[in-house]
């Protein structure tokens, strides 16, 4: 806040509300006035090996607190595309976003506080890859019109060639402004080489500012060709996501996670960290904060 006063603009504070202490961290974030918190049990299950029963229970209360405190949550679907193919598995990202949306609504979180995640992670050598990325981003924006979408930059196919990398980030920024993404994490030209220097971060901000200003209203001016590559790609992804969600509805979310449906990573229902902290609710169990916070 002191730096914000110094530079004359509001700076949002962000932290992670994940692991084995999701509700506790959410409470601390609320007390400290944080603006954004990563809050995603599915990410914890897949990438941090947290037990799925434990973290989904924790996630509910943590999201109740985040919703009450006005904190925007982020979800981690973008990470799926670092381990799975971004073209073939794009529908799993959308399916997970839809699941995460419903889990957030159950916890009383407004749509405007949902930073549902996705990413620009297709192979840059893919023919018409930009059109597929644009289709994915536009589709996500149309399906979640009120959400503060979190859009992640290319990392998987950053080779250390800083010149090509800067162009990849520019294409990513173009799609971000074109499709009105909510939270845009900027790519670094030195991705895959070293932890970014401040000078690298400056170049990334300069890149984004140039494109965001120069292409500010492109999304208002350009319409997509009926049954063209972009529309057909979006339809294909949506259809596959629908089929997958119907399968998950039949089998259950835990079974889907055990089978490695998301991110090509399999996790056992009774494995991972924290299961010993899960117990059945007693008949006299009561948590007054849920009702108070959800009826704010």
Q: Each predicted region: which residue ranges?
A:
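Anaerobic metallocofactor- and corrinoid-dependent redox/one-carbon enzyme cores
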Residues: 1-296
